[in-house]
């Protein structure tokens, strides 16, 4: 079994998943991608995750609804959100629930890398933002 951090990327846009997957893998992390929150919930990787990177607005369950669901199940995995439709109310809701960052698409890779590093530091107990 690998000790590499495991990151889930959830977005209904295949090109965003592929681009984000490439960036996160280039940092040396293991990645699983999912086209929806529901597909993610059917996976057997939920308890192994170090971080979830999710689109806010997706068909079916939204990224924020997924975060809330996992919290009700006792899973406090760090979340990074990105969205093409920024909404201050939703951002505040996500951050209040513990989101590490909330990025607007298109986002720059450095912002995602910083958020991911903060999430992984939070996950291993060394801090956060």
Model regions: which residues?
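Two-component/phosphorelay signaling modules centered on CheY-like receiver
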Residues: 14-32
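Acidic catalytic/metal-coordinating carboxylates
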Residues: 35-36, 62-66
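Active-site beta3 strand of CheY-like receiver
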Residues: 47-53
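Receiver (REC) domain active-site loop signature in two-component systems and cognate sites
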Residues: 58
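Alpha4 helix (beta4-alpha4-beta5 surface) of REC/receiver domains from two-component response regulators
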Residues: 65, 86-101
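C-terminal output helix
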Residues: 89, 107-117
